[in-house]
Amino acid sequence: MKVVITGGGGFLGSMLCEALLKVGELTAPSGNRQRIESIELLDAVFPKLSVDPRVTRKVCEISDREAVFDAVGTDADVAIFHLASMVSGECELRFDDALRVNLDGGRNIFDAARAAARTTDELPRVIFASSIACFGGDVIADSFADSSKQLPRTTYGMTKTICELMINDYSRKRFFDGRSARLPTVIVRPGKPNAAASSWASGMFREPLAGIDCPLPIRRDQRHPMTGYRTVIASLIALHELPESLLGGDRAVGLPAHQVTPQLAQQVLAEIAVEHDLRIGKIVDAYDDRIQGIVNGWATAIDGSRAIQLGLPQPPPVKEIVKQYLKDFASV
């Protein structure tokens, strides 16, 4: 079977590709396990060449409907992992582009999967990387579960919510078998800060570990749901493999997360500095009203009990997540 990964040139997309190559097979629309014959990565840019002959790269935007349909193809034996998206900070500044990429692009993916379906009994599986930005409100609840009302306070969250609802309805109508993974903020991302309003979450670990001071645009007591990238990759694959009957009509599953503050990050960094004999940079207060305002509208805690009941993995302790980053990306 074929796998298509949108956002395949990004951090999570490239890691998912590597994980799938190691797994080697997935459940096909027939319900049987099939060997992964090829993986097609879609993205606007790719940082490095692929060395595995099973992997091809297509430079395109998901708003290009023809390119998306060409990549997905007409064979129902395809698994689609839809990770491509404009990030939260960009969406707030570029509303029309957010609609073009996140909504129009999402519909292109969904319609291509629908067109590839063989019968209503053998449907391509579509795994969508959604976000806890679907939640919000004037008053933030103590915790948000899969049953909580979605009231996003950002354009990014709005587009994710709409795509979740589309996946529910396309699945109800038997156009494809869709599942949405509602991701907490993923740490620790290697490289440089990006335009996401949550970029500080990785930065407050990544930069100090490299001996660099990190500007912090939010309050030090700000609580925020976070999980590790290894857990997210394992969860995306596990969600793909779940029997459809376990999901019912609600296809969006919120992944478990730790409630992390910059204060906790500072404590974890201090412990790791001692254990690994590292010179740690500082987390420096650099308060930004715009970023704090966005974060104020986000969930501070996630109830991931449904995901756990479905057998999806829980994240290891925050300290272990940071150690995984050091092991995987110490030279980055």
For each of these PLM feature ranges, what is it?
Residues N168-R223, Y229-A234:
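NAD(P)-dependent short-chain dehydrogenase/reductase
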Residues L49-D64:
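Rossmann-fold cofactor-recognition segment
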Residues K2-L26:
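N-terminal Rossmann NAD(P)H-binding glycine-rich loop of SDR-like oxidoreductase domains
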Residues I62-V101:
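NAD(P)H-binding glycine-rich loop region in Rossmannoid oxidoreductase-like domains
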Residues P208, T231-S235, L239-I291:
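Mid/C-terminal beta-alpha module of Rossmann-like enzyme folds, strongest
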Residues Y287, A299-Q309, P316-V332:
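Amphipathic terminal alpha-helices
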Residues G137-I140, L151-R179:
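Active-site Tyr-X1-5-Lys
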Residues R107-T154:
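Conserved Rossmann-fold NAD(P)-dependent oxidoreductase catalytic core, especially the SDR/UDP-sugar
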